[in-house]
Regions:
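Catalytic cores of histone-lysine modification enzymes
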Residues: 3-103, 189
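C-terminal SET catalytic tail plus cysteine-rich post-SET Zn-binding segment of SAM-dependent SET-domain
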Residues: 96-195
Length: 195
């Protein structure tokens, strides 16, 4: 006797609901051990050229609408996966600077695994791993203790911290200059001499 694959499928380990990080998120529907395969990140397989075109199009749209929802995931050197296409609940997993999940590519497919033990109700997150060259376009709202303020790969954090330190020093110098200007006594206008 064979059971249908539908009856044999495991219950979902996640649920989609409102997130404090960014609109919609994915949350653990059960306690999970480290290295648990949670969900597959699915979508349309596209070339790097098409990926770049869509990315630019989405960034232009974001400037107009404020919605910067980009679900393009690097698959390999030739292809990306556009998770905005089709049924893909994994696209709602938000970024965190202290993620509890990570993505792995297995035989051309992307799976999200738990990095550590996760409690039922915890929001599932992973580090999006963006390049440093676009850091200003991607502020981070994760709220974790070690948040660096922008969505970049952890390997870029030391350089990003140096950049932010320089920006802060430049801004502080500018503010001190403005404060000094404001503190200067205003010269009183000289009275006109009587003739």
């Amino acid at each position: 006797m064979h059971l249908s694959s539908h009856l044999m499928s495991a219950p979902l380990l996640y649920e989609v609901r409102e997130s404090e990080i960014h609109n919609t998120g994915i949350f653990a529907a059960a306690d999970m051990e480290p290295n648990t395969r949670i969900v597959e990140y699915v979508g349309e397989k596209i070339t790097k050229k098409e990926s770049a075109r869509r990315g630019i199009e989405l960034m232009e749209k974001a400037k107009e609408t404020g919605d910067a929802a980009v679900y393009i995931f690097t698959l390999n050197k030739r292809y990306d996966l556009d998770g905005a296409q089709g049924e893909n609940p994994a696209r709602y997993i938000n970024h965190s600077c202290d993620p509890n999940c990570e993505a792995f590519i297995e035989r051309g497919r992307i799976f999200i695994y738990s990095k550590k033990a996760i409690k039922k109700g915890d929001e599932l997150t992973y580090n999006y791993g963006f390049d440093l060259d676009t850091w200003e376009d991607h502020p981070c709202l994760c709220g974790s203790e070690n948040c660096v303020g922008f969505i970049v790969d952890e390997s870029h954090w030391p350089k990003l911290r140096r950049i932010l330190k320089r920006h802060a020093a430049s801004r502080q110098k500018w503010l001190e200059g403005e404060a000094a200007k404001a503190a200067k006594p205003v010269k009183k206008a000289r009275k006109a001499a009587k003739i």
